[in-house]
Structure formats: structure tokens, C-alpha cells
Amino acid sequence: MTEIFSTLFGQNDAQPPSGPAALGFAPGKPPPSMPPNQAPIAAQMPGQLGDDGPLLRKPGAMNEPFYLLRELPVGNDLTGNTNLITHYNLEHAYNKFCGKKVKEKLSNFLPELPGMIDCPGVQDGSSLRSLIEKPPVCGNSFSPLTGALLTGFRLHTGPLPEQYRLMHIQPPKKKSKHKHRHHHPQDPLPLETRTDPTKKKKKKDNEPERRKKKKDKKKKKNRHSPDHPGVTGSQPNSNSLR
């Protein structure tokens, strides 16, 4: 640290006077005699002990000059003038996400159309307005139709031939209805819904037995319940006998 200070402020700076000259006495005059009870300041200051025990301050080191200096900051490459995209090599990602996607040309969808259809028609004079205002000069490109070609435009008497009758007739649309499962006696039942008659007879035979069992269970529950009249009527009789 002293080397850095010497380089910054110079080595030829005048050092402060030490000893009696620092106290304001002339070099020729002897220092005043101190009373015996007053000891020097360096001797009176007790040494401070650290964690390990050695002295942190020495009496002889109090008169040495010291300076509170900080190390110079390290130069930083990243400043406001640097481009962070090029610094971190993110040019490809920037072009991928931030670049505008070029739309496909119209000629890619309509390759059979002649001319330059990608550019507007005002440039090459192929717009509809330019064709109306300045029609192109054509020669005898239109030739009259022959008699064989005109037969296609003539009206014929009589009904239409059978092969052309159904061309203009549209088939009726099928009405979509909700399918309801109704059983019609005339329709045959599918195999899944067909049941054996023996099973139906067994179910009918078991129905009265099941009803009897349910009635017996209800009677047993009513007997054991406290609301049953037979149970409440038997309790006072038992108490009277006791």
C-alpha cells in the first residue's frame, strides 16, 4: 500500500517532523522535563490482545505514518457502449425471434398465372383500371364462330333429353332426426336384446318369494324398534310384576 501511495503522491514529499520538533520545540532547545508520575503515551497504552493472544499494537509502531487507501477498481469490459448481443453471441437467437418473417409470394400459390403477379399492377400497367382506361390494341384476333359452334347456343324445340334432365334437379336433403329407440313389433329384435323365455319365468316365480322375505325383515325391524307398540306396552307390565 505504501508503494501505491508513493507512486500517486510522489516520493519527495516532505515528511512531518518527528520527536520534539513535532511538539513545537526548536531543535536546539532541550525537551521539557516530564514529571515522574506522567509516563509517555506509548508506554501507558496497554497492548490489545487478539484471539490468539499476540499483541496487535506495539508502542514503537505508533509514530509510523499510515494511510487509509483502497485498491483501484478493476476495469470492466461491459459498458453501456458494448453490444450485449454480439458479446454473448446471441445474434442467431435475435434474428430468429425478433426478425420479421417474410411472407411467401403470390406466385408460389398461383404458379400458372402469367406475368409478374408479385408486384402491384400499377407498375407494369396490368391493373384493371389501366385496362379500362387504356385498352390494349389488338388485331384481328377474334374470329367469327362457325355454324357448328353456333349450334351450342341455339334453342331446340321439344323436351330435354333424358341424360340432361337430372342435371339441374338437386337431390333432397336428408333430415337428421334424433334417434329414439322405439320397439316396433314388426321390426325384428337384435340378438343382444333377445332373451330366453325360461329366464322370464324364473324371475316371475322368484318375485313372490322376494316379497315375503322383505315383509319378514320389516316385521323384525319393527319389533326391535322402540317405537313399536308391542314393546312399549310390555315394559310397564314387567315393571308392575317386579
UniProtKB/Swiss-Prot annotation:
GO terms for cellular component: mediator complex. Keywords: Activator, Nucleus, Transcription, Transcription regulation. Residues 193-210 have a biased composition (Basic and acidic residues). Coiled coil: none annotated. Residues 171-184, 211-223 have a biased composition (Basic residues). The keyword Glycosyltransferase does not apply. It is found in: Nucleus. GO terms for biological process: positive regulation of transcription by RNA polymerase II. Its main location: nucleus. GO terms for molecular function: transcription coregulator activity. Belongs to the Mediator complex subunit 19 family. Component of the Mediator complex, a coactivator involved in the regulated transcription of nearly all RNA polymerase II-dependent genes. Mediator functions as a bridge to convey information from gene-specific regulatory proteins to the basal RNA polymerase II transcription machinery. Mediator is recruited to promoters by direct interactions with regulatory proteins and serves as a scaffold for the assembly of a functional preinitiation complex with RNA polymerase II and the general transcription factors. This is Mediator of RNA polymerase II transcription subunit 19-A. It comes from Danio rerio. The gene is med19a.
